[in-house]
Amino acid sequence: MNIGRAIKVTQAVVDIKFEGELPKIFNALKSKLKYKDKELVLEVSQHIGDNIVRCIAMDSTDGMSRGDEFVDTGAPISVPIGRSTLGRIFNVVGELIDECGPLKGKYNLEPIHRAPPSFTEQRIQEEVLVTGIKVIDLLAPYLKGGKIGLFGGAGVGKTVLIMELINNIAKAHKGFSVFAGVGERTREGNDLYHEMITSNVININEHEKSQAVLVYGQMNEPPGARARVALTALTMAEYFRDRENQDVLFFVDNIFRFTQAGSEISALLGRIPSAVGYQPTLATDMGAMQERIASTTSGSITSVQAIYVPADDLTDPAPATTFSHLDATTVLSRQIAEMGIYPAVDPLDSTSQSLSAEIIGEEHYKVASEVKRILQTYKSLQDIIAILGMDELSDEDKIIVDRARKIQKFLSQPFHVAEIFTGMPGKFVSLSDTVSSFKGIVEGKYDHLPEAAFYMVGNIDEAIKKAELIQAEAK
């Protein structure tokens, strides 16, 4: 047994001195004493000479003192994998935190640090993943096995959108979902758990019938837990992809907190910061995780990642580094949220590699392109409208502005997960309905309907009914 002693404790970073063999980088060390009735797990991060290793703590170091003994486990942090993990909530080191008793059934322990799949193992799918959300399905469609980023500042609706995607995709999707709560609010994690129980995605009486695993390292946790919890969840998702040959959904809320935790640790480890105070290894840390989220010949992982944008600045190094790894980006805009249009997705800033006629079909591509053209023209006319008013526009431009405003309103949609706040029943709109509805708007079939009829409805039939109600009330 290789035992070391703590010689220095600095918040989440602990220096341990070993007399014998030094533990390898990423090895887990476990405390012989218990702090707050729990073993403390450390992860080796640096060898700093004189038989001393510098480690990151996965839990609070409160109550620790110099001289406390730690045992080298001889392996990285290892977490349970297998079907028995379904329906349960884990923390970063694979301990259950849902108070539903011990893990039942067979499971193996797997290290959280692994190499990504090789080039020969990877494959690309060109099948669109229908979300039931109009603005996404029409203008920035998602691919099965793709990486999707939801970008937005504070309070523009990232978590609500990710919860609606879980609701729409995980319910319709018969495979398994893994959710990683990285440095977000505990209340939201609790809400999501109960929402999953209500919708039968999680069965608390018979866990083996559940379809989801939850892994939480919330914002009150030390940076070590927040920096590693995404890897813990990813390890569990990889099991379903590689051993069960499943198409897995992997949700992360919020990937920025992963970067932020890395930045906190980097400063405590004494590294010189790079741009805007981020860790010098930002691109490497992000790449090591993102490269593991891949589709292989065994199965696929479709990931949806919420990405907080500090001060609404998309050029900040944290969101900018994430951009390069994604297949589709859904950008949430404060200006659109202020107009009362939810989801507050920016139709011109959001992008998708799958927006091509070969993947989505000729009709869908033409409609999406025309919608973007109308919105872009309206955007360029806004200065003229603000200074001179609508009367100074040509007749053709007036028609474009009218259609653009209807499109803007029609891109809003009531969500199932927001029913309790809005009082409106949620709507799931099929892809064919979305394309045909917008095709009618851009062709001018609905120019006679009032603008208000397009706000917060599902398909175009609902807009027509709403227009009839508005006209009846006007009489």
Curated annotation (Swiss-Prot):
Disulphide bond pairs: none
SUPFAM superfamilies in the record: C-terminal domain of alpha and beta subunits of F1 ATP synthase, N-terminal domain of alpha and beta subunits of F1 ATP synthase, P-loop containing nucleoside triphosphate hydrolases
EC number: 7.1.2.2
Keyword Nucleotide-binding: yes
Residues binding ATP: G152, G153, A154, G155, V156, G157, K158, T159
UniProt cross-references to InterPro entries, sorted A to Z: AAA+_ATPase, ATP-synt_VA_C, ATP_synth_F1_bsu, ATPase_a/bsu_AS, ATPase_alpha/beta_chains, ATPase_F1/V1/A1_a/bsu_N, ATPase_F1/V1/A1_a/bsu_N_sf, ATPase_F1/V1/A1_a/bsu_nucl-bd
Reaction catalyzed: ATP + H2O + 4 H(+)(in) = ADP + phosphate + 5 H(+)(out)
Gene Ontology cellular-component terms listed: plasma membrane; proton-transporting ATP synthase complex
UniProt entry keywords in alphabetical sequence: ATP synthesis, ATP-binding, Cell inner membrane, Cell membrane, CF(1), Hydrogen ion transport, Ion transport, Membrane, Nucleotide-binding, Translocase, Transport
Membrane topology category: Peripheral membrane protein
Compartments reported by the entry: Cell inner membrane
Broad EC category: translocase
One function term, GO molecular function aspect: ATP hydrolysis activity
KW Transferase (keyword) present: no
Major subcellular site: membrane
Protein family per UniProt: Belongs to the ATPase alpha/beta chains family.
Xref: NCBIfam families: atpD
Oligomeric and partner information: F-type ATPases have 2 components, CF(1) - the catalytic core - and CF(0) - the membrane proton channel. CF(1) has five subunits: alpha(3), beta(3), gamma(1), delta(1), epsilon(1). CF(0) has three main subunits: a(1), b(2) and c(9-12). The alpha and beta chains form an alternating ring which encloses part of the gamma chain. CF(1) is attached to CF(0) by a central stalk formed by the gamma and epsilon chains, while a peripheral stalk is formed by the delta and b chains.
Function: Produces ATP from ADP in the presence of a proton gradient across the membrane. The catalytic sites are hosted primarily by the beta subunits.
Protein name: ATP synthase subunit beta
Gene (UniProt): atpD
